[in-house]
Amino acid sequence: MSMSTLRHFLWLGALLLATIQVSALPTAQDLICNGHPEYCDRRYSELSFVGAHNSPFVGPLLQHNQDISVTEQLDFGIRFLQGQTHKNDDGVFSMCHTSCILEDAGSVSSYLQTVKTWLDSHPNEVVTLLITNGDGLDIKEFDDAFNAVNGIKDYTFAPKSKLALGDWPTLRELITTGKRLIVFVDSKADTNRFPYLLDEFSYYFETPFSTTDENFPQCKLDRPAGGKPDGQMYLVNHTLNVNVFGIFLPDRFKAGRTNAAVGQGSIGAQVDLCNSIYHRKPNVVLLDFITEGDVLKAERTMNGL
């Protein structure tokens, strides 16, 4: 074989290899966003999520709200995580249930590290955190917790100004820009100082929490006080409680019924009620014991799948 012929074959081989490599790259049509290609070109504000209420508080005790860890919740398919914060007796900013004496699930930075580690290995997923500020601390405490987790702030979405409902990016845009972590705080947010820590009630209203009626017969605006639903996303607290001498405990025994996709007292039934009032489906439905019932089916139904 002559040298020119050999060079010709090598050139053809390189061209073929390059063609194969290019064809193997994911195209815009190949992208799957939060598990569904249908979600990619929907705005964040147009999607409905089921969320894990009190996501860090895991176990079999009366005060626990979930049965599986935060990582397992994400693996299960949950993309909206809520949790409470307080400072414990040692002054550590922690994920604590009502008080750190009742339940201390570790530092806020440890919780954030768990989320960041999961995001690292799931590049096509958008996750939302709703973190409550139980002690009314300066928002810098939250920023300090994020700063303690190397690289997590690279994922955070920080709009340049407050977004109207129709101005939110699509999941595709969030994924392709790498801004796949949306963070809301329920009080003391200051987006002039920390633009990625979004004020929950500038974007959402909520229905009442600590419900004890297993049929969830209402969907009224509870917070913020005096708020109006127009132009806001909204969050439904679909968590059933038992009142034990004035202490509200999650009702683990009825979780299968509460978290059913359809039927009386189900996710679907309350979503239908809310939709009849606000003429749009909830953006978030918060749930205890997310492995009970059929919560992901309910989420798909809310999103028209």
Curated annotation (Swiss-Prot):
GO terms for biological process: lipid catabolic process; signal transduction. SUPFAM superfamilies: PLC-like phosphodiesterases (SSF51695). InterPro entries: PI-PLC_domain, PLC-like_Pdiesterase_TIM-brl. Keywords: Glycoprotein, Hydrolase, Lipid degradation, Lipid metabolism, Secreted, Signal, Transducer. It is found in: Secreted. GO terms for molecular function: phosphoric diester hydrolase activity. Glycans are attached at residue 237. This is PI-PLC X domain-containing protein 1.
